[in-house]
Amino acid sequence: MKIVIAPDSFKESLSAVSVAACIEKGFREIFPDADYVTLPLADGGEGTVDVLLQGLAGQKRTHQVEGPLGALVNAEWAMLEPSEYNQNKTALIEIAAASGLDLLKPEQRDPLVASSFGTGQLILEAIEQGAQTIILGLGGSATNDGGAGIVQALGGRLLDSKVQDDDGQELNRGGAALAELASIDLTGLDSRCADVELIVACDVDNPLCGDNGASHVFGPQKGATPDQVLILDKALANFAQIAESQGCVGGDDPVHKRTGYGAAGGTPMGLGLLFNMQIKPGIEMVLDVLQADEVLKGADLVITGEGQMDNQTLQGKTPYGIAKRASLQGIPTIGIAGSLGTEVEALYGEMSSLFGTVRSPQSLDQVLQEAEKNLTRTARNIAATLKLGRKILS
């Protein structure tokens, strides 16, 4: 029996590699002689660089940048060697490495002031090192600033409405400040940006603004209160309106409605002012690089998972992506999550069954501390149930 274990990370607790190891350990208690193939995955969020380096030759590097609240952090990125996949000198960057939620303690999270400036510094470093193409993974950000910090780091000026001279004053960093935006000055932008191809690996398809936009859907997990969600949504809408009125963005469709622009607190909004940008589903990119379709051939079962599965999983997350690939080959998929959330039943179209690992009410700290034990136990119990089913049917 061939079992492919292809999970994402469990946010704030286990890496994708650790998740795969726990699942294999649990299954081996029941099926010790099965053929196990582990395929740790990512969809543009945390761990994307490490996962892509499984299939592409490259070197990891470290650069000191400003974190989401300004404190210095050592952020990892990678430069790829030329290959069939990447003809140009290509950099791999995660927004989570410089502007990530995991860089802050829960009580520090504040999307009103958190900035993507450090991610802009990483992009600038990659350009300095000769990158012609940049693959930027969006996911796990602490920010809701529409990529404004990136614009500022690369030489753009965002000017407020409190005019003290003809130009106005530069905005403070953070999402809330965008409510005061009156004009955008890109004359000081690093000229090399025009020659860089930017590929955004995105794990959601939400628009920039509105009830399904960046602030309403993802703001609360970054620390936003209901009132702050409204402030942030209006601020992003103002950013989009100013950019459109000044002709800073191309295309006929309204910026605030564009698919994927709600990723990472609206980061594609700012990126679109600076680069020749393509937005691609991060999981599809990762699956192609790792030749997942070949790995799946001959498999009897796929097991995937992430920290939480809910209706957002359908919008470009790892479990749904690998389950669709498995379904095309007639392979059943089982999903394991720390918790099963809103409208998770929608996943039954691609997954045979879903399991949560938390068995009793616990504090978040306790859930995170016991993630490895809970996951291994759940995997073991799933395997035991499968074995019982085979016995009953034989």
PLM features: residue spans?
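N-terminal loops that bind phosphate or other acidic moieties
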Residues: 1-138, 142-394
